[in-house]
Regions:
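Redox-cofactor binding/interface segments in oxidoreductases and associated redox assembly factors
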Residues: 69-70, 95, 146
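Interdomain hinge/lid region at the active-site interface
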Residues: 209-276
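Conserved small/polar residues in nucleotide/adenosyl-binding loops
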Residues: 281-283
Length: 283
């Protein structure tokens, strides 16, 4: 197991990783690097005093970091990769928690970066951002998708898998392309729909606003909860996986238009047939 772990980007996901590692293994040292100027104060207030803050990534060698987890928004990856590549990381494995993989793999391969990179994506999270909202148990019984690059060492892949399993995660290996196709449907499009629905509700008359909150059922509340996710993170996800999301968006709009046509025509038979068919689907 790793001895010295650096978490780059110490938000909700990063702090949850730290909490889980600290609870399960008292001997592992945890380091954090983040652009937040008050990081050390916030970490201490969050009862994470075992986490040491690095002022610069140049301290990686001095601290004998053997495992790096990138937990930043994805548009920051390119800058981070460049900095990591300037450091001798032959004995270090780098992974990430990003929600898209094709774009990240492309950057790594095109720039011919040399550090040992094993992309991963823990399918876990809550809508609240910030290290204060992290908690131990976030990853328990959740899936983590590992997306090895062609030149990835099996030894390194297995070490990354072992690490995530130590946090009680289930792991699955996929190609970057397959990962992005699956997640565009199960996560990215639903988030886009949530934002769109809440925007639609916000544009209704002001007089309706209080009633929307008062009489919203579970479904609408779920949409508003999802729409409350970290804006910067989701902007990056939408842009990074835009081609897959745009294809699905077109399909989704077509389905909405068909529902609208049936409603306009009062076509009870078509509506009932479609709804009955969908009622048989259980995921």
């Amino acid at each position: 197991m790793f001895k010295n772990i650096l978490i780059i980007g110490f938000g909700m996901i990063g702090s949850s990783i730290a909490r889980s590692v600290i609870k399960k293994n008292k001997s592992i040292k945890i380091f954090a690097f983040d652009k937040s100027p008050n990081l050390k104060i916030r970490i201490n207030k969050s009862k994470l005093k075992r986490v040491k803050v690095l002022k610069s990534l140049n301290e990686i060698k001095d601290q004998n970091i053997d495992f790096i987890i990138i937990c930043t928004p994805m548009l920051q990856y390119q800058s981070i990769f460049k900095k990591l590549n300037d450091i001798d990381l032959q004995q270090t494995i780098v992974t990430d928690v990003g929600s898209t993989k094709v774009n990240i793999e492309k950057i790594y391969i095109q720039k011919k970066y040399q550090f040992n990179f094993i992309p991963s994506h823990p399918i876990a999270g809550i809508e609240k951002a910030g290290l204060e909202n992290g908690f131990d148990g976030l990853f328990t019984n959740r899936y983590n998708i590992i997306c090895p690059i062609k030149k990835s060492s099996k030894i390194h892949i297995n070490k990354v898998i072992k690490f995530w399993k130590s946090l009680n995660m289930k792991t699955e290996i996929m190609s970057a392309k397959e990962h992005d196709k699956v997640l565009s449907l199960t996560s990215h499009l639903p988030h886009l729909i949530s934002y769109s629905l809440v925007l639609t509700a916000m544009k209704k008359e002001t007089s309706l606003n209080s009633k929307l909150v008062k009489f919203s059922a579970g479904g609408f509340r779920d949409f508003t909860r999802v729409a409350g996710s970290d804006p910067e993170m989701w902007r990056d996800i939408f842009l990074a996986n835009s081609s897959q999301i745009q294809k699905l968006t077109s399909n989704f709009i077509s389905e909405l238009k068909e529902f609208s046509r049936n409603l306009n025509k009062g076509n009870s038979h078509n509506l009932l047939t479609k709804l009955k068919k969908l009622s048989l689907i259980h995921i």
